[in-house]
Amino acid sequence: MNKIRKGDEVIVITGKDKGKRGVVLAVGENRVTVEGLNIAKKHVKPNPMKGTTGGVEAKAMPLNISNVALVDANGKPSRVGIKVEGDKKVRFLKTTGAVLSA
């Protein structure tokens, strides 16, 4: 069970974007892509077959999953725990104890 999932609001705790918040767009093996953070400029070749024009576009690049933390209701970073309720595993915030949606 992944502790951080697509759609979670996270805050960056280390790196050039430290303190910034965003929503998780994608989760990989050990990496997460966060909307509007860790932006890099990628050069794109024009492709007349697809109808794309060339140029330089800004793209959100993945961050290491250890560099982000979930945001609790108070707006502070929180670690995530996993506990069993009934027959299902649920995620909860360690700062407030609030259960996250399954």
Curated annotation (Swiss-Prot):
User: Which Pfam families does this one have?
Assistant: KOW (PF00467), ribosomal_L24 (PF17136)
Question: Does the entry feature the keyword Methyltransferase, yes or no?
Answer: no
Q: Which HAMAP family match?
A: Ribosomal_uL24_B
Q: What family does this chain come from, according to its entry?
A: Belongs to the universal ribosomal protein uL24 family.
Q: What is this protein called?
A: Large ribosomal subunit protein uL24
Show the PANTHER family listed in the entry.
MITOCHONDRIAL RIBOSOMAL PROTEIN L24
Q: Which domain of life is it from?
A: Bacteria
Query: Do you know which SUPFAM superfamilies this protein is assigned to?
Result: Translation proteins SH3-like domain
Q: Which InterPro entries match?
A: KOW (IPR005824), Rib_uL2_dom2 (IPR014722), Ribosomal_uL24 (IPR003256), Ribosomal_uL24_CS (IPR005825), Ribosomal_uL24_KOW (IPR041988), Translation_prot_SH3-like_sf (IPR008991)
What are the entry keywords? Ribonucleoprotein, Ribosomal protein, RNA-binding, rRNA-binding
One GO BP? translation
| Organism from which the protein derives | Paraburkholderia phymatum (strain DSM 17167 / CIP 108236 / LMG 21445 / STM815)
**GO MF, one example:** rRNA binding
GO cellular component terms, alphabetically, are: ribonucleoprotein complex; ribosome
Q: Please describe what this protein does.
A: One of two assembly initiator proteins, it binds directly to the 5'-end of the 23S rRNA, where it nucleates assembly of the 50S subunit. One of the proteins that surrounds the polypeptide exit tunnel on the outside of the subunit.
The record, for NCBIfam families, names:
rplX_bact (TIGR01079)
Subunit details: Part of the 50S ribosomal subunit.
